[in-house]
Regions:
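Feature for secretory/organellar precursors and membrane-associated catalytic proteins
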Residues: 24, 37-116
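Short, positionally conserved secondary-structure boundary motifs
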Residues: 1-60, 93, 119-124, 130-140
Length: 140
Protein backbone atom coordinates (compact mmCIF):
# COMPACT_ATOMS: atom_id res chain seq x y z
CA UNK A 1 0.00 0.00 0.00
CA UNK A 2 1.20 3.47 -0.83
CA UNK A 3 2.17 5.56 2.14
CA UNK A 4 0.20 8.73 2.55
CA UNK A 5 2.37 11.79 2.17
CA UNK A 6 2.15 14.29 5.02
CA UNK A 7 0.42 17.52 4.06
CA UNK A 8 2.77 20.29 3.14
CA UNK A 9 2.66 23.60 4.90
CA UNK A 10 1.03 26.49 3.11
CA UNK A 11 2.38 29.95 2.39
CA UNK A 12 0.48 33.10 3.36
CA UNK A 13 1.50 36.77 3.16
CA UNK A 14 3.05 38.35 6.25
CA UNK A 15 2.56 42.08 5.98
CA UNK A 16 5.63 44.08 6.91
CA UNK A 17 3.82 47.10 8.36
CA UNK A 18 2.97 46.27 11.98
CA UNK A 19 -0.58 46.48 13.27
CA UNK A 20 -0.81 48.60 16.36
CA UNK A 21 -1.72 47.23 19.72
CA UNK A 22 -2.64 50.67 20.95
CA UNK A 23 -1.02 53.01 18.46
CA UNK A 24 -1.88 54.16 14.94
CA UNK A 25 -0.45 52.23 12.02
CA UNK A 26 -1.05 52.26 8.26
CA UNK A 27 -3.41 49.76 6.66
CA UNK A 28 -2.17 46.53 5.11
CA UNK A 29 -0.40 47.23 1.83
CA UNK A 30 1.59 45.48 -0.85
CA UNK A 31 4.69 45.22 1.33
CA UNK A 32 4.73 41.59 2.46
CA UNK A 33 6.85 38.45 2.50
CA UNK A 34 5.91 34.79 2.30
CA UNK A 35 5.19 33.22 5.68
CA UNK A 36 4.83 29.49 6.22
CA UNK A 37 2.03 28.06 8.37
CA UNK A 38 0.60 24.59 8.96
CA UNK A 39 -1.38 23.20 6.03
CA UNK A 40 -4.55 23.01 8.14
CA UNK A 41 -4.28 26.60 9.43
CA UNK A 42 -7.30 28.82 8.81
CA UNK A 43 -4.99 31.85 8.49
CA UNK A 44 -5.15 33.98 5.35
CA UNK A 45 -2.35 36.35 6.35
CA UNK A 46 0.01 37.23 9.19
CA UNK A 47 1.00 40.55 10.70
CA UNK A 48 3.45 41.71 13.34
CA UNK A 49 1.97 43.38 16.43
CA UNK A 50 3.52 46.57 17.78
CA UNK A 51 2.82 47.68 21.35
CA UNK A 52 1.91 46.14 24.71
CA UNK A 53 -1.83 46.79 24.92
CA UNK A 54 -2.68 43.16 24.07
CA UNK A 55 -0.36 41.61 26.70
CA UNK A 56 -0.27 38.97 28.13
CA UNK A 57 -2.09 37.19 25.28
CA UNK A 58 -0.32 38.89 22.35
CA UNK A 59 3.20 40.16 22.98
CA UNK A 60 4.87 43.22 21.48
CA UNK A 61 6.66 42.32 18.24
CA UNK A 62 4.92 38.93 17.94
CA UNK A 63 3.33 37.69 14.72
CA UNK A 64 -0.38 36.87 14.72
CA UNK A 65 -2.29 34.79 12.19
CA UNK A 66 -5.49 36.32 10.83
CA UNK A 67 -8.52 34.81 9.09
CA UNK A 68 -9.95 37.27 6.59
CA UNK A 69 -13.74 37.64 6.43
CA UNK A 70 -14.41 35.64 9.61
CA UNK A 71 -17.46 36.62 11.62
CA UNK A 72 -16.39 38.51 14.74
CA UNK A 73 -18.27 37.79 17.96
CA UNK A 74 -18.09 39.45 21.38
CA UNK A 75 -14.75 38.55 22.94
CA UNK A 76 -12.99 37.80 19.65
CA UNK A 77 -9.75 39.60 18.84
CA UNK A 78 -9.54 41.17 15.42
CA UNK A 79 -7.65 43.61 13.23
CA UNK A 80 -9.74 46.74 12.85
CA UNK A 81 -9.38 49.87 10.75
CA UNK A 82 -10.96 52.82 12.56
CA UNK A 83 -10.64 56.46 11.50
CA UNK A 84 -7.45 55.81 9.55
CA UNK A 85 -5.77 53.66 12.20
CA UNK A 86 -5.12 49.90 12.16
CA UNK A 87 -5.65 48.32 15.58
CA UNK A 88 -5.49 44.83 17.07
CA UNK A 89 -8.22 44.77 19.75
CA UNK A 90 -10.84 42.63 21.47
CA UNK A 91 -14.32 43.25 20.04
CA UNK A 92 -17.57 43.80 21.91
CA UNK A 93 -20.91 45.30 20.82
CA UNK A 94 -23.65 46.19 23.30
CA UNK A 95 -27.41 45.89 22.79
CA UNK A 96 -27.59 49.54 21.64
CA UNK A 97 -25.10 48.95 18.84
CA UNK A 98 -22.15 50.70 20.48
CA UNK A 99 -18.85 49.02 19.61
CA UNK A 100 -15.98 48.64 22.06
CA UNK A 101 -12.45 47.68 21.02
CA UNK A 102 -10.65 46.66 24.19
CA UNK A 103 -6.98 46.40 25.07
CA UNK A 104 -6.38 43.08 26.83
CA UNK A 105 -3.72 44.73 28.99
CA UNK A 106 -5.97 46.68 31.37
CA UNK A 107 -3.01 48.84 32.38
CA UNK A 108 -3.42 50.18 28.81
CA UNK A 109 -7.17 50.81 28.97
CA UNK A 110 -6.32 54.30 27.65
CA UNK A 111 -5.89 52.60 24.25
CA UNK A 112 -9.49 51.24 24.28
CA UNK A 113 -11.71 52.55 21.48
CA UNK A 114 -15.43 53.28 21.93
CA UNK A 115 -17.54 53.83 18.82
CA UNK A 116 -21.07 55.02 19.66
CA UNK A 117 -23.77 53.64 17.35
CA UNK A 118 -24.86 57.23 16.65
CA UNK A 119 -21.35 58.42 15.69
CA UNK A 120 -21.50 57.49 12.02
CA UNK A 121 -17.90 56.24 12.29
CA UNK A 122 -17.18 53.35 9.98
CA UNK A 123 -15.26 50.42 11.40
CA UNK A 124 -13.69 47.89 9.07
CA UNK A 125 -12.60 44.47 10.30
CA UNK A 126 -9.68 43.00 8.33
CA UNK A 127 -10.11 39.65 10.04
CA UNK A 128 -10.17 37.60 13.19
CA UNK A 129 -6.90 36.97 15.02
CA UNK A 130 -6.54 33.21 15.49
CA UNK A 131 -5.82 32.52 19.16
CA UNK A 132 -5.85 29.37 21.25
CA UNK A 133 -9.00 29.55 23.36
CA UNK A 134 -11.43 32.29 24.31
CA UNK A 135 -10.30 35.42 26.15
CA UNK A 136 -12.73 36.87 28.71
CA UNK A 137 -14.01 40.40 28.18
CA UNK A 138 -12.63 42.99 30.63
CA UNK A 139 -14.71 43.58 33.74
CA UNK A 140 -13.73 47.23 34.13
Amino acid sequence: AAQRQPERNKIIPRYMTPAAAGYASPALGDDYEDYEVAADSEADFAVRIAGDSMEPYIHDDSIVLVKRGATIFDGDVGLFFVDGDMKCKQYCQDYLGNVYLFSLNRARRDADVTIPASSGITICCFGKVLLKGKIPLPQD
